[in-house]
Amino acid sequence: MSTTITNSTAERKHSHVDICLRGDVAFSTITTGLERYRLRHNALPELNYDNLSTETDFLGKRIGAPLMISSMTGGYSEAAELNGKLAEAAERFQLPLGVGSMRQALEESSHRDSFAVVRRHAPTTQIFANIGAPEIAKGLSSDDLQTMIEMIRADGLIIHLNAAQELFQPEGGTDFRRVLDEVAAITAKLSVPVIAKEVGCGISAPVARQLLNAGVRVIDVAGAGGISWQKVEEARYTRRFGTDDRFSTRGLEELLNWGTPTAECLVAVNALRENPTPPFSLIASGGIQSGIDIAKSIALGADLAASAGALLRSLHSGTLEETLTTWMNDLRAAMFLTGSATIAELQNNRPISKQ
């Protein structure tokens, strides 16, 4: 919801990270829904735990585990250090990495190194460029697209759909007309695959089908249950204006917790594979907090999971690699106890039941 204020994109990016680290911005009335599912125990796994590998394939490349370090930040001076450390971890574990929105890099070349740094620290793993729906709606030139791809030698482009965030953002862009047409134009122009993701409100099956028909190759449902970006932007708004009189008290509470749980989105979008539809990969994100969450997501049909908030907090506390190691151990334990020798078996056997 736009208003007459001035604030640079760089300042906004910095405040996003600060609020996510220090503020209470989690959904308060919605969970991911993953807790409603239970991985089914196999008393005869017939496996050697020590030989289990979490490796899998994503967009034609072998990766270390079905986990993406999801889009977080970039476009301000301190972001270079954060992105460099994220890239180092991605390289060590051979995990895909998504950068934050590259709008700032298109606006000001001085901020490009905060994104380019990732490829220097992660020369072999998959890295994905990122741009938002409001920028898409305005139309991106072929030069803009090429600049983003070349800047980080990207393996693909993430387009994030963030209508609720933009609604709450003080300087948000809420004209979402022609986004789908522009997505189709971009997929036709680019030689790399396009990922469409939400940012915490979820993607429904009908919207996923529209995106797939527009040429998108990967759907990241990014459902509710983790960070509420409405709350992040609300915190920015109240820091600046003191109170928020844009909505009624009751309406505000509902809107701050607006969204569809991650598990609900995942099950619905995965069901599209049962009907004629373009082939696609499926990512589960939104409140992923452990390797067990990853395992449940895979068992519900995801090809991989993705996490941003939990990994950002562990990076801030200096425990990112330790966190990733424990998550991989969680995942291998779940594979062992469900009798799944590979990630494909965990996905195809559906060893999961609803509580």
From Swiss-Prot:
Origin: domain of life: Bacteria
Biological processes annotated in GO: isoprenoid biosynthetic process
Enzyme Commission designation: 5.3.3.2
Amino acids binding Mg(2+): 166
Keywords: Cytoplasm, Flavoprotein, FMN, Isomerase, Isoprene biosynthesis, Magnesium, Metal-binding, NADP
Cofactor(s), by name: FMN; NADPH; Mg(2+)
Cellular compartment(s): Cytoplasm
A Pfam family reported for this protein in Swiss-Prot or TrEMBL: FMN_dh
Function: Involved in the biosynthesis of isoprenoids. Catalyzes the 1,3-allylic rearrangement of the homoallylic substrate isopentenyl (IPP) to its allylic isomer, dimethylallyl diphosphate (DMAPP).
Family: Belongs to the IPP isomerase type 2 family.
Protein name according to UniProt: Isopentenyl-diphosphate delta-isomerase
Species per Swiss-Prot/TrEMBL record: Chlorobium phaeovibrioides (strain DSM 265 / 1930) (Prosthecochloris vibrioformis (strain DSM 265))
